[in-house]
Amino acid sequence: TDMSTYDKYPQRDLITKWRLIKKDPPAELSEPVEPIVFWVDKATPEEIKPMVVKGIEVWNLAYERAGFKNAVVAKIQPDDSDWDAGDIQYNVVRWSSSPEPGFSGYGPSIGNPRTGELIAADRVQEFNAIKRGYNYRKLWGWTPENDPLEQWIISLTMHEVGHTIGLRHNFSASYLYGPREVHDKSITGNTTIASIMDYDPINIAPPGLEQGNYFPTEPGEYDRWAIEFAYKPNLTDEERAELLALSVLPAYRYGTDGDAMGTPGRNIDPRTRRGDMSNDVVTYTADRFITLDNKIAELPEIYSDEGETKNDFTNSFYSLVSDKGRFMDIVAGQVGLSLIHISEPTRP
């Protein structure tokens, strides 16, 4: 709270961020004097390690917008290392196996309260998330070019790393592409949403459409914009104003935890909520129901191999039925609500 202002709302939102200094200050693109280094826990399964590395280092695409090359570096903890993954001297992506995990991961960090400089961070990701990824493969199929397990782990890692470099949730990010556009890689590139900081469901194409990305594997346009605003050195007032002016465009819409529509009576903008997809959730849900119903009918065949258990079948069945329930709830939330235009105070 800014006690030196006479504004009606004196609250100010401040980002915590890492200290990045260019080796070559005049250069448009320069490596930092000290990069942000994240370690991958040596206990990470071998197949998963390169996915986690990519989920870390792909953030360099956003930092290049801010003028930094190789700002984020991923290293794999050596098998013979004598330091613990919980050592605060190392920023580590490590794994937990909780009995009933509430989240697939979380990304806490430690900042200097006087300056806002981040000095340490950890990402804890649940082993249950890896199991979920393998189940995605079993249910939806995969190829080396379009692997839901790989995309899920990259996406999850990106999201948690995003928290540890200063970004909050953005639950408006899914409201960017149309319900058919979101399956078209020529439109979405390597994303499905405007920001990796949303909670997005697996993106499944309906019958008749080619499968696009299951999950985003690069920072979205909002992420690149936010990192540029936060980390670009020596922004002039004019440059800062130009960046802020973009906030009214669809790719830069923002709504975080306090804005997200949830249980009845909590917030009123249906575009800002967890677990939805596309800017026409009614059409997307109708498409998804067809896909889910078809997959439910296929479950007996999918789980007919020797060694498959009734428990595997039942878990997948309830998962698919629950997915239908979540999307019905999202559709119901479209009725009788209001759109909030945070960056457009004169708009009705």
Enumerate the language-model features and the residues they cover.
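Auxiliary tRNA-acceptor-end handling modules of aminoacyl-tRNA synthetases
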Residues: 1-44, 62, 66, 77-149, ...
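Zn2+-dependent metallopeptidase catalytic core
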Residues: 43-71
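Stable alpha-helical elements in mature extracytoplasmic
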Residues: 48-55, 149, 153, 157
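Short conserved micro-motifs at the rims of enzyme active sites and ligand-binding pockets
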Residues: 50, 105, 134, 206-212
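Sec-exported extracytoplasmic/periplasmic mature domains
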Residues: 57-68, 162-163, 167, 202, ...
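The catalytic-center signature of Zn2+-dependent metalloproteases
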Residues: 76-97, 151-207
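Polar, glycine-rich mid-to-C-terminal structural blocks
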Residues: 117-156, 211-247
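Conserved catalytic/binding loops enriched for acidic/polar residues
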Residues: 174-343, 347
